[in-house]
A protein has these predicted regions:
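Histidine-centered active-site/metal-ligand motif
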Residues: 246
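Active-site His/acidic residue clusters
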Residues: 249-269, 315
């Protein structure tokens, strides 16, 4: 029997709700068709936003949405996406499929979407091909209430009051598609650009996000922090509130990533092993951040993460459309548990991407919509948002099919909500073994337990023909004991227990 020990009174750090954030880019069918269909569409919508998608996202309590990219952000010129739609400039989306971008979804539409979702706004600015003035004027357009050219332009375009802007990314992937810069050059550009990302609302400051590393580029993290902290007052912590990190799971590598649906046991464990590498990245980048920011004033912002496979056969290679199986449910559960356990440093994360792109929570086909296994994991994990991480540990054994791709059989995180409920999320990575869990809750009297689970065979997925193949089901097989609870977690599953 496996032992899980939980100490609900030993609180460690707050799990920011933003850890459960999402990412939307002008890429494939994410924005257009997936979220925005226009006011004249026969698909039910409110001001152009699909009502089915909006309601589904509200159900999982989406806390923050990042936009407009991604690589698209550093070729996006925001003034092309305001004003009457018929006069907006068209452009070629050179990064993603070479399609025409008509800019019918712009700043006003994004904030309309955030308002409908009830979520915070994370805008990524254009440092790669844009100017300091362009970035400064965008922030002014969005947030300034007084008399100014940009505030007047916003009012002319139909929005009298400014919006609230919660996060602003000063460039994206500037080590690559955002300008192919070296870390010292980018850091100096960051210093200059961020100066003009002004806080016009002292009671609602913009949190500035600096472009961090790609995967394990620890030199980038070190050099960027060194340059931004040089000749900078200590209390300004490099003039940043967050430093980003991007990491994707590519089962077979970057060039040939592997199928989203056709994989064997070896690739299953290989994928989960790569998902677990997120913890190493957080720890090693976090160690470098500790040198410059021991008080953890700078949040680690994992604003692109998830599984990236070879696109579905017959789809545009530039649209990055892929299916979603129980493997993705496990990748999501593993990764979110890691974020929870490192919530002292990880302050926001954004799954790539929200609809129809990469590890989506929603897929659409015309008027039809399906919820993916990943969606259902976010649904179960939403109770961790703004809860307190508490001390927990679980006994594990190593499993897998080859020595190189071994993984622990179980992974967990536990939080306590404001109402005192203990929320346990547990993943079983094994393809063939259930585990009986003896759970000890220290100094805690268990009165009630509710459970829910997502589980199935590793290839199971939801399709437009069978949309409910994978879904959240009740889990009632929990026994109360003198020391806590006892239950058996099935193979290939993600479990959430609420204990009171």
């Amino acid at each position: 029997m496996t032992k899980l020990v939980i100490n609900p009174s030993k609180k460690q750090s707050k799990i920011n709700k933003e850890i459960y954030g999402h990412f939307s880019e002008h890429l494939g069918r994410c924005i257009y068709e997936g979220i925005y269909v226009g006011e004249d569409s026969p698909i039910p919508n409110k001001n152009g936003m699909r009502t089915d998608v909006v309601e589904a996202l509200k159900h999982i309590r989406i806390p923050v949405l990042r936009w407009p990219g991604g690589c698209f952000a550093d070729e996006y010129h925001w003034k092309d996406g305001i004003g009457p739609k018929e006069t907006r400039k068209k452009m070629i989306n050179t990064h993603w499929g070479g399609v025409v971008e008509d800019n019918s979804f712009g700043t006003h539409e994004f904030f309309e979407l955030c308002e409908q979702l009830g979520c915070e706004a994370y805008v990524n600015g254009n440092l790669g091909s844009g100017t300091v003035q362009e970035m400064s004027e965008w922030v002014e357009y969005i947030t300034f209430e007084g008399v100014s050219p940009m505030a007047d332009l916003r009012k002319k375009n139909g929005h009298e009051k400014p919006w609230k802007l919660d996060f602003f990314g000063v460039g994206n992937e500037n080590w690559g598609c955002g300008g192919n810069m070296n870390p010292d050059f980018y850091a100096n550009e960051y210093r200059r650009y961020q100066t003009y990302v002004r806080n016009y609302h002292p009671d609602h400051p913009i949190h500035k996000v600096c472009c961090g590393a790609n995967v394990d580029d620890y030199e980038w993290t070190s050099e960027v922090l060194k340059t931004t902290h040089n000749h900078c007052l200590k209390e300004l912590h490099g003039n940043m509130d967050g430093l980003s990190l991007h990491y994707y799971v590519h089962p077979e590598g970057w060039e040939i990533k592997g199928s989203a649906t056709d994989f064997d046991d070896k690739v299953w464990y290989k994928s989960l092993n790569k998902a677990l590498f997120m913890e190493t990245l957080i720890e090693r980048h976090g160690h470098i951040m500790d040198e410059y920011d021991p008080e953890k004033k700078i949040g680690m912002i994992v604003d692109e993460w998830g599984a990236w496979y070879t696109v579905e056969p017959g789809t545009n290679p530039g649209f990055l459309y892929q299916q979603n199986t129980m493997r993705d449910a496990l990748i999501a559960g593993i990764t979110l548990n890691i974020f929870n356990k490192h919530s002292d440093r990880v302050k926001m994360a954004n799954l790539a991407q929200i609809v129809n792109v990469l590890q989506s929570v929603i897929l659409t086909d015309g008027a039809d919509m399906i919820l993916t296994p990943t969606y259902h994991v976010f649904d179960m994990y939403k109770y961790h948002q703004d809860a307190m991480l508490v001390d927990s540990s679980i006994e594990t054994e190593t499993i897998g099919v080859e020595e190189e791709w071994q993984v622990p059989n179980l992974a967990e995180s536990v939080s306590v909500a404001e109402d005192g409920a203990v929320h346990i999320t547990l993943t079983n990575l094994s393809l063939d073994k259930d585990y009986e869990i003896r759970t000890i809750l220290t100094d805690y009297q268990v009165n009630e337990v509710k459970g829910e689970i997502v589980h199935g065979e590793m290839h199971e997925m939801n399709t437009f023909e069978t949309p409910d193949q994978v879904r959240v089901k009740e889990f009632n097989e929990v026994e109360k004991t003198a020391e806590g609870i006892r239950f058996t977690i099935p193979k290939c599953s993600v479990l959430h227990l609420e204990v009171r």
